[in-house]
From Swiss-Prot:
Pfam families: Transgly. This is Biosynthetic peptidoglycan transglycosylase. Pathway: Cell wall biogenesis; peptidoglycan biosynthesis. GO terms for biological process: cell wall organization; peptidoglycan biosynthetic process; regulation of cell shape. It is a single-pass membrane protein. InterPro entries: Glyco_trans_51, Lysozyme-like_dom_sf, PBP_transglycosylase, Pep_trsgly. Its EC number is 2.4.99.28. GO terms for cellular component: peptidoglycan-based cell wall; plasma membrane. The keyword Cell membrane applies.
C-alpha cells in the first residue's frame, strides 16, 4: 500500500474514532439529562420539520405538548403496551421471542417486513436517531436502548415515549394527539380513544386517527381485547407505571 493511501486511511480512521467518541458523549449526556429533564424535541421531529422546509412546506409545524404521566390517562399507557410491547415491564430493552418470530416471518414474507422493536427501542430511535433501516442504525439503537434501560425507570421510558410518539402529520405526543383528534386533554382519554391512537402507531402517516380504515378499526378492537387480557387499569398500578 502506498504512503499516500496509508495517510488517507489513517486520517479516516482517526476521524471516525473521534466522531464515535463525540457521539458517545453526546448520546450519553442526553440519556443522563433526559432521565430527569423534559424532552424538548426528538430527532424524528427535527427530521420531519427540516424535510418539510426543504420541500417548501413552511406551514408544517412538528407540534408536541409535554405532559407528565399523571397528566395522561392510564388507558393510554396500557394501550401502547398492549399494542406494541406486552412484555415491556419485564424485559431489559429487547423482546427476544418477538425478534425470533419477526425474523422467521420476514424470511417467509420478504415483501411484508415485520418489526419487533420494543417501546424502549422505539424511544431510543425516535429520540436520538434518524429514520431508516440499516445495520449501523440498528447497532446504535441497541446501544442507546441499553443505556436508557440502565439509567431510566420503566415509567420514565413510557412517559418519554408517549410524549414523542408520532400520531399523525405534525402531531407528536399524546397530549397533542388528544387535543387534535378528540378535543380534550390526554388525561381524559377513554379506553376506546386510547386504543384508536395506539392502533395507528405502526405507521401514523399512513393510518389516520381522524379517518380510521377498516384495518385500523380491526386493530383497535384487537388492542382493546389485549388491554382486557393484560388485566386492565390495575396492570399499570401493579408495575408502577401510572
Amino acid at each position: 500500500m502506498s504512503k499516500s493511501r496509508l495517510t488517507v486511511f489513517s486520517f479516516v480512521r482517526r476521524f471516525l474514532l473521534r466522531l464515535m467518541v463525540v457521539l458517545a458523549v453526546f448520546w450519553g449526556g442526553g440519556i443522563a439529562l433526559f432521565s430527569v429533564a423534559p424532552v424538548p424535541f426528538s430527532a424524528v421531529m427535527v427530521e420531519r420539520q427540516v424535510s418539510a422546509w426543504l420541500h417548501g412546506n413552511f406551514r408544517y409545524v412538528a407540534h408536541s405538548d409535554r405532559v407528565s404521566m399523571d397528566q395522561i390517562s392510564p388507558w393510554m399507557g396500557l394501550a401502547v403496551i398492549a399494542a406494541e410491547d406486552q412484555t415491556f415491564p419485564e424485559h431489559w430493552g429487547f423482546d427476544v421471542a418477538s425478534i425470533e418470530k419477526a425474523l422467521a416471518h420476514n424470511e417467509r414474507n420478504e415483501n411484508r417486513i415485520r418489526g419487533a422493536s420494543t417501546i424502549s427501542q422505539q424511544t431510543a430511535k425516535n429520540l436520538f436517531l434518524w429514520d431508516g433501516r440499516s445495520w449501523v442504525r440498528k447497532g446504535l439503537e441497541a446501544g442507546l436502548t441499553l443505556g436508557i434501560e440502565t439509567v431510566w425507570s420503566k415509567k420514565r421510558i413510557l412517559t418519554v415515549y408517549l410524549n414523542i410518539a408520532e400520531f399523525g402529520d405534525g402531531v407528536f405526543g399524546v397530549e397533542a394527539a388528544a387535543q387534535r383528534y378528540f378535543h380534550k386533554p390526554a388525561s381524559k382519554l377513554t379506553r376506546s380513544e386510547a386504543a384508536l391512537l395506539a392502533a395507528v402507531l405502526p405507521n401514523p402517516l399512513r393510518f389516520k386517527v381522524s379517518a380510521p380504515s377498516g384495518y385500523v378499526r380491526s386493530r383497535q378492537a384487537w388492542i382493546l381485547r389485549q388491554m382486557y387480557q393484560l388485566g386492565g387499569e390495575p396492570f399499570m398500578q401493579q408495575h408502577q407505571l401510572d
